[in-house]
Curated annotation (Swiss-Prot):
It comes from Streptococcus pyogenes serotype M1. GO terms for molecular function: GTP binding; metal ion binding. Residues 28-199 form the EngB-type G domain. Its cofactor is Mg(2+). GO terms for cellular component: cytosol. This is Probable GTP-binding protein EngB.
Length: 199
């Protein structure tokens, strides 16, 4: 996106939900996908960086997002919220269906510019987190790792937790790593800088 193009991030709305490519928006707007395990804070991330309270519905029940949700941002950019992975109470067949839907989008969508891969800063990445990061690297899809829930950890321990996450992911230094908290509104500007650099 050209520097002179100012993005009004508050001018955002949910556009549509899609189960497969026949339902995707048919235009050339750049898209940023958001991926992460259930309850990592994807909806809170979307709401926080867009300055909206309930645009993306947060849920106490993990596994709520079952479709690709496309958010229109100022008619210049879209966020695509993909179903949270790693939720045990969803059947194997349902998980396989979600996996196929996510893979189809990530590997075939020309509009896709980068993926924001959300992980929980408090814990070492899950097997699914590592698989997602490896998948994105394999397909050469630009990835921005956002480590959420930083407010749950004393600031003095952030570096230690960041090191644990990076080591587990075998983090590529050319990728961007952002410590984020929707509660304390930490990492918003860094997230936008990284996103706009890709579009």
């Amino acid at each position: 996106m050209a520097e002179e193009q100012v993005l009004n991030t508050h001018n955002a709305s949910i556009l549509l939900s899609a189960a497969n490519k026949s339902h995707y928006p048919q235009d050339d707007l750049p898209e940023i996908a958001l991926a992460g395990r259930s309850n990592v804070g994807k909806s809170s991330f979307i709401n926080t960086i867009l300055g909206r309270k309930n645009l993306a519905r947060t849920s106490s029940k993990p596994g709520k997002t079952q479709l690709l949700n496309f958010f229109n941002i100022d008619d210049k950019l879209r966020f695509v919220d993909v179903p949270g992975y790693g939720y045990a109470k969803v059947s194997k067949s349902e998980r396989a269906k979600w996996g196929k839907m996510i893979e189809e989008y990530l590997t075939s969508r020309d509009n896709l510019r980068a993926v924001v891969s959300l992980v929980d800063l408090r814990h070492a990445p899950s097997k699914e987190d590592i698989q997602m990061y490896d998948f994105l690297k394999y397909y050469d899809i630009p990835v921005i790792v956002v480590a959420t829930k930083a407010d749950k950890i004393p600031r003095g321990k952030w570096n230690k937790h960041e090191s644990v996450v990076k080591k587990a992911l075998n983090f590529d230094k050319s990728d961007t790593f952002i410590v984020f908290s929707s509660v304390e509104r930490i990492g918003i500007d860094d997230s936008w800088d990284a996103i706009l650099e890709q579009v």
